[in-house]
Amino acid sequence: MDTPKMGDLYQRIANQINEMIPSEWENVYLYAEILDDSSEVYFYFNIPGKNEFLYSHNIPEHFNVSEDIYDDLLIELQESFEELREEYEKNNPETWTNLTLKLDRTGQFSIDYNYEDVIASELNGSQRKAVWVYKNLGLMPKRKTVRDFLEDYIKTNEGKI
């Protein structure tokens, strides 16, 4: 169940994402993993007229943005997701561990919450990321070891991805 505070947090998160991207953009696909003792947030976005998706952590290099400014904005975004998780816990019997947020430039968004115990998962962080990127963007990893893993994973989990 969403609460008014969650609605405010969704708006704040959308604004923070917009502030982090130093250009016009079409779509954002964001992954947030918030656990009791750690958090990770990253996203991919595309620029109008281009099909290529850019990785959020490459913004400083790609757009010549200060790494310190980017890191500060990323920490603020992570804190917003931590606050969202706390608010969610107050109003729902089950706590999510990660989510996928899809946002377009008109402000339309969707959030898919996932309750999987990522600590107990057989996949490590880079493998989870590879699966998520493939599921949401259809992109294969560049690094051979991760690409080989994903190809095997796709074969093994055919129809589940």
Swiss-Prot record:
<protein>
    <recommendedName>
        <fullName>Immunity protein YezG</fullName>
    </recommendedName>
</protein>
<comment type="function">
    <text>Immunity component of an LXG toxin-immunity module. These modules promote kin selection, mediate competition in biofilms, and drive spatial segregation of different strains, indicating that LXG toxins may help avoid warfare between strains in biofilms. Neutralizes the toxic abilities of cognate toxin YeeF upon expression in E.coli and in vitro.</text>
</comment>
<dbReference type="Pfam" id="PF04634">
    <property type="entry name" value="YezG-like"/>
</dbReference>
<keyword id="KW-0963">Cytoplasm</keyword>
<comment type="subunit">
    <text>Monomer. Interacts with the C-terminus of cognate toxin YeeF, probably with 2:2 stoichiometry. The second YezG molecules binds with lower affinity.</text>
</comment>
<dbReference type="InterPro" id="IPR036170">
    <property type="entry name" value="YezG-like_sf"/>
</dbReference>
<dbReference type="GO" id="GO:0005737">
    <property type="term" value="C:cytoplasm"/>
</dbReference>
<dbReference type="InterPro" id="IPR006728">
    <property type="entry name" value="YezG-like"/>
</dbReference>
